Structure formats: C-alpha cells, structure tokens
C-alpha cells in the first residue's frame, strides 16, 4: 500500500497516553517518557505513532512524526462506517458497528480519539479484552484498515453493487 503524503493534509493531533518509565542505574533512577499520539484530518485520514524521549514534549513530537508515517484512509459513508468490523491487536479487540445519524461516537478514550480524528461522527464500539491504550488504538486501526466500500467489494467479486447489497 502506498504511503500517504501528510504534507498536503491539515492534520490535528491528540495525545492519547503518556507513560513515564524508570531505568534503575547505580546513581538512582533514570526517567524517560513515551507518548502515544493519534493524528487525523477529520476527512478519512488517520494514523498513530509512539514517541520515546527523555522529555515529554520531545516524546510527543516524535510520536507525531511517527503517526504521519502511518496514515491510513478510512472509508467513511456519510457520517459512519460501511459495515461492522472487529479489530484485533494482541489481547485487545475492538468491535466497530455503524450507527444511524445523530447517534454520536459511543466509544472509550483511546478508541474515541482515533474515530474522531478519522472523521467518523456516528458509530458504536465495544472494547473486548485488553484495555491497554496502545493495544486499543492499534486494534481500532486494524478494524478501520479492514473496512471496504460496497464498490470495492463489487469490483473484487466482478459483480455490481446491486447484486451485493441485494
């Protein structure tokens, strides 16, 4: 899959999680930080990145750089997704279900950040398994990556959209 050029997009960023880790050395503890960041344009492009550094702002900057390298295109139909999907990463599983207009984003913290920046306004989600922010963000991204529009499925099967939708 071709990499998406982030320079032409107006990306917003959201810090999902900041973690402080300690390395114990002879003189005491050395602290460093990792930041899980999600970026998106609200029009179907979204990505996530993990940045690690000795200071929080530097970790966030690195996370944003990484997120811009991992952008994906999400097929948005109106204000929701085309069909239900299950995203899995490690022990984290996230169920994504399309919702009617006016429902809003029914999702927990890390999942909500990804969906809002992807430009999805009506969706139902359920976190199954791990509640680790990293696993949930990655599982959500896998679920969004697995989505296909009816036109794409029809083309793959060599049929018309009417034949597939019934």
Swiss-Prot record:
Pfam families: Ribosomal_S5, Ribosomal_S5_C. One of its GO terms (molecular function) is rRNA binding. The keyword Nucleus does not apply. Residues 11-74 form the S5 DRBM domain. NCBIfam families: rpsE_bact. PANTHER family: MITOCHONDRIAL RIBOSOMAL PROTEIN S5. Belongs to the universal ribosomal protein uS5 family. The N-terminal domain interacts with the head of the 30S subunit; the C-terminal domain interacts with the body and contacts protein S4. The interaction surface between S4 and S5 is involved in control of translational fidelity. This is Small ribosomal subunit protein uS5. It comes from Heliobacterium modesticaldum (strain ATCC 51547 / Ice1). The gene is rpsE.
């Amino acid at each position: 899959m071709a990499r998406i050029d982030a320079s032409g997009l107006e990306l917003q960023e959201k810090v999902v999680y900041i973690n402080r880790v300690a390395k114990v050395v002879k003189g005491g503890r050395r602290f460093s930080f990792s930041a899980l960041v999600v970026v998106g344009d609200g029009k179907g492009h979204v990505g996530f990145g993990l940045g690690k550094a000795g200071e929080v702002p530097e970790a966030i900057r690195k996370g944003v750089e990484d997120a811009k390298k991992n952008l994906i295109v999400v097929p948005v139909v109106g204000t929701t997704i085309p069909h239900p999907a299950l995203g899995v990463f490690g022990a984290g599983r996230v169920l994504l279900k399309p919702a009617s207009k006016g429902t809003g984003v029914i999702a927990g913290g890390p999942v909500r950040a990804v969906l809002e920046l992807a430009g999805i306004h009506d969706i139902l989600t359920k976190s199954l398994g791990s509640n680790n922010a990293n696993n949930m963000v990655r599982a959500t991204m896998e679920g969004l990556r697995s989505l296909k529009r009816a036109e794409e499925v029809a083309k793959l099967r060599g049929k018309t959209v009417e034949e597939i939708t019934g």
